[in-house]
């Protein structure tokens, strides 16, 4: 039987590896009660998949919202705060991590439609000297190749020292550090380019850090200002923001629980809610809500944000294997029932998210888990399968390392993974 490509290498989570802070161990009841907090009737398969993320996956809580021809549905399980028993709520703000990339790509495509740049422009044209040396030549890398991960530029979040500080034992000391885009690109360029990137896409956060720099160079404004002006305000995404150096989260929000990517079942759990997201910047600093992301996804796919020519460019798929592929700031996955979905996933410290929809723009799902140690990747994918297929496949267990190994976002490798 064909395994549903859900080693969803593309559409499954931004693996930005977890950060943690002050020691905080949730009480045992945190994952014992998979009740559906404030869930509304319907979507039984999805409801069951959410409960499984808490009950079988050991996650603190999960919240999801869907939108289709029948209207909107909200479902949740577990807790926003395991210490107080506060449940997840429809208005919860969370860190969407690499879902940011879809917003950045949309802005660049809008700029192309306005004649202010071309995606066939090179990095060297816009940012002279930035990508040069150690086998790199920015005059041969186009903006398009940044957005579909065929640039070959190394992923700075695979650097061992960076991982140590951003995701491991160094996090408590470094959680409030501010990073510049130039610093992040310089880390990446210490490593040689990926071979034949146009034949085999290689996911790299560095691509979108550079893309954010191009937005700033082309407009004279930060990527956050441009996304806010062009997308957030017109769509009235009132729960969406780009925090910059601020480590705070707007209320309401769940506690973001992290295990520092320690695999031991009894690994200590930490509160990673506060963090300075300049370590991802244009590659992943968005804060949003399930409702906002559904609205954005629907407007985008229905062509409300881009002209037809740019929409076609965004959805031009570069296959990455097993029924998955990359567009420009979006990813594709073929589900077990034959439905092909498009969207983006995101994972950062204490937060796992997905923004997924059908390619006709008629059906959307966004969900967020406020924990980051899910070892059984099939439980995550089952939430997508349940919503768009109405059921989950018979196979429900991926290898214990399936999640980090199969997902290319943010941290392509983990400390000690050897990948």
Q: What is each PLM-predicted segment?
A:
Residues 57-60, 84-145, 195-204, 281:
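Short active-site loop at a secondary-structure junction
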Residues 135-341:
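Short, surface-exposed loop or secondary-structure junction motifs
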Residues 50, 70, 101-104, 108, ...:
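Residue-level preference for non-acidic, small/hydrophobic
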Residues 2-5, 26-75, 268-419:
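Catalytic loop of the DD-peptidase/beta-lactamase superfamily, centered on the K-T-G motif
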Residues 19-27:
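C-terminal segment of classical bacterial N-terminal signal peptides
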Residues 1-15:
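N-terminal export and membrane-targeting signals
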Residues 65-67, 97-98, 102-118, 206-217, ...:
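Primarily hydrophobic membrane-targeting regions of prokaryotic envelope proteins
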């Amino acid at each position: 039987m064909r395994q549903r490509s859900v080693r969803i290498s593309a559409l499954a989570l931004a693996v930005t590896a977890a950060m943690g802070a002050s020691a905080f161990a949730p009480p045992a009841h945190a994952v014992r009660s998979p009740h559906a907090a404030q869930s509304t009737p319907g979507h039984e398969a999805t409801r069951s998949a959410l409960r499984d993320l808490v009950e079988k996956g050991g996650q603190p809580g999960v919240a999801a919202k869907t939108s289709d021809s029948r209207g909107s549905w909200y479902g949740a399980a577990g807790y926003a705060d395991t210490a107080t028993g506060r449940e997840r709520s429809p208005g919860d703000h969370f860190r969407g991590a690499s879902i940011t990339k879809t917003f950045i790509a949309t802005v660049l495509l809008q700029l192309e439609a306005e004649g202010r740049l071309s995606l066939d422009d090179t990095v060297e044209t816009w940012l002279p000297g930035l990508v040069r040396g150690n086998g790199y030549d920015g005059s041969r890398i186009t903006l398009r190749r940044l957005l579909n991960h065929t640039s070959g530029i190394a992923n700075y979040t695979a650097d061992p020292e960076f991982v140590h500080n951003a995701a491991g034992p160094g996090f408590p000391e470094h959680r409030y550090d501010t990073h510049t885009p130039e610093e992040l690109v310089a880390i990446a360029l210490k490593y040689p380019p990926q071979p034949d990137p146009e034949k085999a896409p290689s996911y790299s956060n560095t691509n979108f850090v550079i893309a954010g720099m191009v937005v700033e160079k082309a407009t004279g404004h930060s990527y956050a200002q441009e996304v806010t002006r062009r997308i957030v305000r017109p769509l009235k995404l009132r729960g969406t923001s780009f925090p910059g150096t601020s480590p705070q989260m707007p209320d309401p929000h769940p506690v973001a629980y992290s295990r520092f990517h320690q695999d031991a079942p009894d690994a200590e759990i930490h509160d990673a809610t506060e963090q300075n997201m300049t370590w991802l910047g244009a590659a992943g600093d968005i804060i949003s809500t399930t409702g906002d992301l559904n609205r954005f996804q629907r407007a985008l796919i229905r062509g409300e944000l881009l002209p037809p020519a740019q929409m076609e460019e965004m959805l031009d798929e570069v296959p990455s294997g097993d029924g998955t592929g990359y567009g420009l700031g979006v990813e594709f996955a073929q589900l077990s029932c034959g439905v092909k979905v498009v969207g983006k996933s995101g994972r950062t410290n204490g937060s796992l998210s997905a923004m997924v929809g059908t390619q006709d723009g008629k059906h959307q799902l966004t969900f967020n888990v406020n924990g980051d140690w899910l070892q059984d990747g099939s439980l995550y994918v089952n939430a997508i399968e349940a919503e768009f297929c109405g059921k989950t496949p018979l196979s429900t267990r991926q290898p214990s390392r399936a999640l980090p190994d199969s997902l290319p976002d943010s941290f392509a490798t983990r400390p000690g993974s050897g990948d």
